[in-house]
Regions:
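Extracellular Ig-like/FN3 beta-sandwich strand-entry sites
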Residues: 262, 306-308, 883
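Beta-strand-rich extracellular modules
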Residues: 270-272, 314-316, 873
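Sec-dependent signal peptide recognition
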Residues: 2-10
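Aromatic-lined ligand-binding clefts that engage carbohydrates, nucleic acids, or primary amines
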Residues: 257-277, 311
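Short, surface-exposed tryptophan/glycine-enriched loops
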Residues: 298-314
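Catalytic-domain carbohydrate-binding cleft regions of carbohydrate-active enzymes
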Residues: 118-214, 237-249, 274, 303-308, ...
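N-terminal accessory segment at the very beginning of proteins
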Residues: 19-209, 243, 264, 281, ...
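N-terminal signal peptide c-region/cleavage motif recognized by signal peptidases
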Residues: 14-16
Length: 921
């Protein structure tokens, strides 16, 4: 399954280099056009996918690194030359190209405009980056006033609709780049470039000028000194200053801002510690970052010209030493949006038309690869901690899950199972892991699986390091500078862009780990983490100077793609029928084809961080990536939680934070608990009788009962390029109120989920999009669509609603995923609209499904007749249940039925694979 990236070659050999402006040549898959600025190529990839490339040279446009898989266009299309304009037509699209400028616009088959490039929108400028003579490439498009824009990976700014925001796109801890931009108008743009990129206005953020900042004072929040006049909101060192330094005092700034023009202003903070920013009394930024991982937060605010706005900033250091507030005035490029890359041979993007957004995602995966099936056990509970120090410690945790009969599948061994000076050996420290084979076997005997942490990082002095170094597979700047990590040892990373290095890396972890029986891979720090935290763009550039695929700047966002390829290809070669599971901190377009899930990095244990994970996960999902997860409970704790003797009120907040986060996590693709310092197992949250423990246990049981539904969503992700965690725009694009929301989402086609992200909240406002209707999952009460309700949220429940017409399968009580088949199968049917659901099942651990070994059971609800049809089973596999009991629970307006673990069915049937019709009313 290895993907050896093809050389993409743009050889306009049919065009002489002296071709006149406006001359073009038709080719089998499109046209090549000479403009005054360069050479444009428009290719028909599919009847709804168009590739646009633009280069300065009329002779050569070549690349050897791309996330796009090889393809052979075979699409019927026609060309019409109207003199000043060339029209290309497929069954689903019309593409117009202005001959003298090369400006491209896209229309649907009826001639309705979808998207248009801005005149002069191909911008390719000569540049030198890392000693390479190259180009900066930028493309501008006309923004539609009524559209929202989503995607480009995972951001931590609390935004989902990124239209009007300016974003830096480079991989670093908690921020993941996937260059797919998706519009509410039903199209996507895949920007095929791996270098540092930017979305939006290219002007840098700047300190607020003195003429716009009046009466600014700064004072310690403890009142120890009077306010002092200052010229900027800032503390401490510049980005990349590293750890340590004197601790500044908690401080408050107050003053006013004068807006020079009317429009959208962006404010950005770069900070660690806790920061809050108010404008005219409205809290616009509420952000906390650990001291060693300084990062940005950003907000867009509309201000009116010549008006003053009160500004207040409060900063609590909590181990931090850096704060900087900057702004950007309204862009002169209003009405446009753009993508820019630092290193490019030219503009290169794919226009994908849905118009359903599920189709946009599906065609992104057509270009970059389909997601294989994850093992069934991956959809159970993952228990992790930083870190289990001994084999016995983790084994005791597994045993405690089984003793307590808490549903659970996966234990995670984080870093430093090796000796302190042996990073990269992948060898267990015998003093703490005396019998690795016996430990792994014991975990398996308890019906659990083991994921283990592996880094592409090496300390000098080991056989693995020497083998990599002697082959030329290690990045040298770290070694030359004798750079040390936070533990105090020199280190570097291997060059994942080298096929030979990837093969060597796999051979090392295969011998040390996979052959012992490791079940899954935790590929940490896959940006890669080349410099001490906080990471900087310049640090990434200078410490990845040259790779096997070109300069580090050219490919720097793609490291995780090739690192995942190393493990996926290696394992499929070593054990062809053993499903791969990779968890990676970074990601990129195409990592989904290597059985890779991404988690949101080293986030903090705060309510605001939890709230930001909702749009972070949704942005990542709509970027075409089906598997996302997070550190439930947050990774780094605030001091009030991490102290040895927390105050009772802080301890209660800690427990509730974990419980609410777990409740949210149950309705995400992967359920994973992880964090540092404190024990994260649910029984540590106040004991068996505490509501936090009871809430997590209830939701864990619910997760396992939902497995038939969740695994079907996974089957959809593989077989039909489905999306599990869904921004509301994917299902309700016409409902503007829905698509603006960042704190609600769909989990599959049935569930609308509204997590609780505030301490002591026992209700919250929930908007129910326009549809056939909704039901409260817990009570069964019908709720009108297109309305906002005050939804109850007791400690052990978050607002969850089910769309009318949904059919949701639930399985039996389980202790682990493979304990028994989904028998009996309980179908909850939510009346009010016709509905359908196709249950997907396969063996769960092998790749036999690739050969057709899976089954599907179509289920249909007919609203008018009140009948449920469980259709004839299609396909099969040896291990499938040949027969089972099916219970049906009907929820309707006149018979509200909430979810119950032991529900009384309205009807039951014995199912043997043939169609069964049940009359429910």
């Amino acid at each position: 399954m290895a993907l050896h990236m093809r050389m993409i070659v743009f050889l306009c050999l049919s065009l002489p280099i002296w071709a006149a402006t406006g001359d073009y040549r038709k080719q089998p898959d499109g046209i090549v056009l000479q403009t005054a600025e360069g050479t444009l190529r428009v290719q028909v990839v599919a009847d709804n996918i168009i590739r646009v490339t633009f280069a300065k040279s009329a002779i050569l446009f070549s690349r050897n690194a791309s996330a796009v898989l090889p393809y052979t266009p075979a699409v019927k299309w026609s060309l019409t030359d109207a003199g000043g304009e060339i029209a290309m037509t497929t069954a689903r699209l019309r593409v117009r190209v202005v001959r003298n400028t090369g400006c491209v616009s896209f229309l649907d088959s009826a001639g309705r405009p979808i998207l248009a490039e801005s005149p002069g929108g191909h911008v390719v400028e000569s540049a030198e980056v890392q000693g390479e003579q190259t180009f900066h490439a930028r493309q501008l498009w006309q923004a539609n006033a009524d559209e929202s824009l989503y995607g480009l990976g995972q951001q931590q700014k609390g935004t989902l609709d990124i239209k009007g925001y300016d974003l830096d796109m480079w991989q670093h801890n908690t921020n993941v780049v996937v260059p797919l931009l998706v519009s509410s108008r039903g199209y996507g743009i895949f920007w095929d470039n791996m270098s540092y990129s930017r979305f939006g206005d290219l002007r840098p953020f700047q300190p607020i000028p003195a003429e716009n900042l009046s009466g600014l004072t700064m004072a310690p929040m403890d009142g120890s000194t009077p306010p002092a006049t200052v010229s900027a909101v800032e503390v401490g060192r510049a980005p990349g200053g590293g750890r340590g330094g004197a601790r500044p005092k908690d401080s408050r700034w107050e003053g006013s801002i004068l807006a020079p023009v009317t429009g959208d202003y962006q404010f950005k903070t770069y900070s660690n510690g806790a920061i809050k920013v108010w404008l005219d009394g409205r809290l616009v930024i509420d952000h906390y970052r650990q001291g060693w991982l300084t990062d940005e937060d950003q907000v867009k605010v509309q201000l009116a010209a010549n008006q003053r706005y009160a500004i207040k900033v409060e900063w609590t250091a909590e181990g931090g030493n850096t704060l900087r507030l900057t702004w950007k005035t309204p862009s002169a490029e209003t009405g446009k949006f753009s993508l820019w890359s630092e290193v490019a041979d030219g503009v290169d993007y794919y226009f994908v038309y849905g118009p359903k957004l599920d189709n946009v995602v599906a065609d992104y995966r057509l270009l970059t690869g389909q997601a294989p099936m994850m093992p069934l056990w991956a959809f159970g509970l993952w228990q992790s901690r930083q870190k289990y120090d001994t084999a016995q410690q983790s084994l005791d945790v597994v045993g405690e899950f089984r003793k307590r009969k808490i549903p659970f599948d996966n234990i995670v061994q984080d870093w430093q199972y090796w000796k302190p000076d042996a990073w990269g050996t992948h060898q267990f420290d015998a003093s703490r892991f005396p019998d690795p084979d016996g430990w792994i076997k014991a975990i398996h005997n308890l019906h659990a699986h083991l994921m283990i942490s592996v880094w592409g990082k090496f300390y000098p002095g080991s056989d693995n390091f020497d083998a990599m170094q002697n082959a030329g597979y290690l990045y040298q700047p770290n070694l030359q500078e004798k750079m040390k990590d936070w533990i105090g040892f020199p280190y570097t990373f291997y060059d994942a862009f080298s096929l030979g290095a990837r093969q060597m890396f796999w051979s090392q972890i295969d011998k040390a780990l996979f052959q012992r029986g490791i079940d899954a891979w935790w590929m940490d720090a896959t940006e890669p983490d080349l410099t001490p935290s906080p990471p900087t763009l310049e640090g990434q550039r200078t410490h990845m100077p040259q790779t096997a695929m070109g300069t580090g700047s050219r490919v720097m966002n793609g490291y995780a793609l090739y690192n995942s390829e190393a493990v996926y290809d290696g394992q499929r070669s070593a054990a062809p029928n053993h499903r791969v599971f990779i968890l990676t901190r970074s990601g990129f377009a195409g990592t989904q084809r290597y059985a890779s899930a991404t988690w949101s990095g080293d986030i903090t244990s705060t309510w605001t961080a939890m709230a930001k994970q909702i749009p972070a996960g949704l942005g990542f999902s709509i970027s075409g990536m089906p598997y996302w997860t997070q550190d439930i409970g947050g990774y780094t704790m605030q001091q009030k939680f991490s102290t040895r003797t927390p105050k009772p009120e802080d301890e209660e907040e800690w427990r509730e934070l974990n419980a609410r986060w777990f409740e949210f996590g149950v309705f995400t693709p992967l359920l994973r608990v992880h964090g540092e310092l404190r024990v994260r197992e649910m029984w540590a949250l106040g004991g068996d009788s505490h509501p936090a423990y009871q809430a997590e246990l209830k939701f864990d049981r619910l997760r396992y009962r939902m497995l038939p539904y969740i695994y079907t969503l996974a089957g959809e992700a593989t077989h039909h390029a489905g999306t599990i965690m869904r921004p509301l725009v994917m299902d309700f694009a016409a409902d503007k109120s829905a698509r603006e929301l960042t704190d609600e989402y769909m989990f599959g086609p049935a569930f609308l989920v509204a997590p609780i992200t505030a301490y002591k909240a026992r209700s919250r406002s929930v908007y129910l999009p326009k549809s056939e209707g909704w039901y409260d999952f817990w009570t069964g009460k019908a709720v009108a669509p297109g309305t906002r309700v005050d939804a109850a949220a007791p400690y052990d429940a978050i607002p969850v609603y089910v769309k009318a017409g949904s059919i949701v399968p639930f399985g039996p009580e389980l202790q682990y995923t493979g304990e028994k088949p989904a028998d009996p199968l309980t179908l909850y049917v939510y009346a009010g609209a016709n509905g359908a659901f196709t249950l997907y099942e396969d063996q769960g651990a092998t790749y036999d499904y690739e050969k057709g070994a899976f089954s599907q059971i179509p289920i249909q609800w007919a609203e008018a007749s009140g009948t449920l049809t469980v259709g004839k089973r299609q396909g099969g596999f040896p291990e499938m249940p040949k027969e089972r009991t099916i219970h049906v629970v009907l929820c309707s307006k006149d018979k509200p039925t909430g979810f119950r673990f032991e529900a009384a069915p309205a009807k039951s049937a014995h199912y043997v694979g043939e169609a069964v019709v049940l009359q429910l009313r």
